[in-house]
Amino acid sequence: MQLLIDINMYEGKFPHKRYKLTSEFLNNHVPVSDSILDLGVKNPFTEVMEKQGYVVTNTNGEDLDIDTSAVINSNAEVVTAFEIFEHLLSPFTVLKDIKAKKLVASVPLKLWFASAYRSKTDERDRHYHEFETWQFDWLLEKTGWTIKARKKWTNPTKKVGFRPILRLFTPRYYIIYAERK
C-alpha cells in the first residue's frame, strides 16, 4: 500500500510501517462511508485517511484533559485516536465523553527496557502513560467500550545495541477496534 503524503515533515523518520498497519486495520473495521472525528490536530495520517475516501474532522489542539467539548459536540460515527491517549493525564474522561458508537485507537506499549518518552522541548510531546495491553483494555471496559478486534506490532530501529535487538520482537504498538456497550 502506497501512502500518498508529504514525508518531509518527519525528516527521514516517517513511520511507514505504523501508518501501513494502522491504515489496514482501519480499512478492515470502518467503512469509508462512516464519518470520523480524529482526536488531535490534522496530521499526515489525517491525509492518509482522506485520500482513502474517509471524511475526517480533527480536534483543534485543545487540551483534552480539560476541554472535551469537541468530543461531546461531535456527530461523527467513529472516533479515531492514534497515539493520543498516552499524552493525556486522564484518558478516562475523553473515552467516557465519546458519543460515537465506534472507536479505533492505538497506543504505544510500555517497554520494560526503556523509560517513557518525554520531549524536553515540547510540553505536549510527552507520554504520561505507556500502557500494557491489559491496562488499555481495562480503561476501555471501564468507559463503556467492548473491544471487537486488536493487533500489536513491533517497531524495530536501525540502531546497534541490546535495546534495538529487543525492539525486533517486543511489541511496541497496540491498536483496537471497539464498540459502545
Feature map (PLM): residue ranges:
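Short, glycine-/aromatic-enriched active-site segment of Class I SAM-dependent methyltransferases
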Residues: A105-H129
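Short, glycine/acidic-enriched loop or turn micro-motifs at the edges of active sites
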Residues: V41, E86, L109
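Active-site flanking residues adjacent to catalytic metal/cofactor-binding acidic residues
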Residues: L37, F82, A105
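Flexible loop residues that form catalytic
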Residues: I84, P108, W153-N155
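Short N-terminal helix/helix-N-cap motif within the alpha/beta-hydrolase-1
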Residues: L89-T93, S115
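Conserved N-terminal segment of class I S-adenosyl-L-methionine
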Residues: M1-V78, F92-K99, R126-W138, K148-K181
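Catalytic toxin/effector domains delivered as secreted proteins or via bacterial secretion systems
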Residues: K102
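A short beta-strand submotif of the Rossmann-like class I SAM-dependent methyltransferase core
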Residues: V78-I84
